[in-house]
Amino acid sequence: MQQYLDLMKHILAEGVDKSDRTGTGTRSVFGYQMRFDLSKGFPLVTTKKCHMRSIIHELLWFLKGDTNIAYLRENKVSIWDEWADENGDLGPVYGAQWRSWPTQSGDAIDQIAQVIAQIKSQPDSRRLIVSAWNVGELDKMALAPCHAFFQFYVADGKLSCQLYQRSCDVFLGLPFNIASYALLTMMVAQQCDLALGDFVWTGGDTHLYSNHMEQTALQLSREPRQLPTMTILRKPASIFDYQFEDFELTHYDPHPHIKAPVAV
């Protein structure tokens, strides 16, 4: 994935040094876009090994509407541990907003079910949108949504998706985010009987943490390898019925994992 390495180079060359909420410090650019043709391979970074099992389980957890890390812990996924309270709760984060956005009347909107119904019935709609950025509930969330807003687009029988990520940890978080939304696009396309188009990633505050610079240099020294293939082995009755075993990643030959600290 040369696009990802090019982003790192751009931040190092053009970025500005900024303070941040975690106190770690970043080198940051504002506004960046990458496009991945999903018909040409699954966009999983190859210049370091990425933990696809965690990515899949996290996405399934979002789609369940779950906001407690018990499911993740059961499946040996620890990426949310630092933000959960003593009971494993995170407040109304992604899953809650995707599946049960509260309304003034006391009802809840299932944005995922709604957008899939809209794609099927009104594929040319410009309102094929899901938002996790609920201003009225931000103060209840353990972490405000970083990948905040995504939109689907149908053309020539193909489904594309664009994500707006307001804040992006490029070294640790971004490979997960790209793979997660690429997989979500594949799932929605399958449910709507559409071919695969592009995944477009758009970043706001796009940064490398100051304690990731050595790791970034190591990654930039490596040559990207051929993208792997992701296969969905069955088509379940709905977007909410996928299981971990439904996904098969093949031809993934990454460089070794690179460890880096998480800024909390």
Swiss-Prot record:
Keywords: Cytoplasm, Methyltransferase, Nucleotide biosynthesis, Transferase. Pathway: Pyrimidine metabolism; dTTP biosynthesis. It is an enzyme of class 2 (transferase). The active site is at 146 (nucleophile). InterPro entries: Thymidate_synth/dCMP_Mease, Thymidate_synth/dCMP_Mease_dom, Thymidate_synth/dCMP_Mease_sf, Thymidylate_synthase, Thymidylate_synthase_AS. GO terms for molecular function: thymidylate synthase activity. (6R)-5,10-methylene-5,6,7,8-tetrahydrofolate binds at residues 51, 169, 263. It catalyses: dUMP + (6R)-5,10-methylene-5,6,7,8-tetrahydrofolate = 7,8-dihydrofolate + dTMP. One of its GO terms (cellular component) is cytosol. Its EC number is 2.1.1.45. GO terms for biological process: dTMP biosynthetic process; dTTP biosynthetic process; methylation. DUMP binds at residues 21, 126-127, 166-169, 177, 207-209. Its main location: cytoplasm. The keyword Metal-binding does not apply. It is found in: Cytoplasm. Belongs to the thymidylate synthase family. Bacterial-type ThyA subfamily. Homodimer. Catalyzes the reductive methylation of 2'-deoxyuridine-5'-monophosphate (dUMP) to 2'-deoxythymidine-5'-monophosphate (dTMP) while utilizing 5,10-methylenetetrahydrofolate (mTHF) as the methyl donor and reductant in the reaction, yielding dihydrofolate (DHF) as a by-product. This enzymatic reaction provides an intracellular de novo source of dTMP, an essential precursor for DNA biosynthesis. This is Thymidylate synthase. It comes from Shewanella sp. (strain ANA-3).
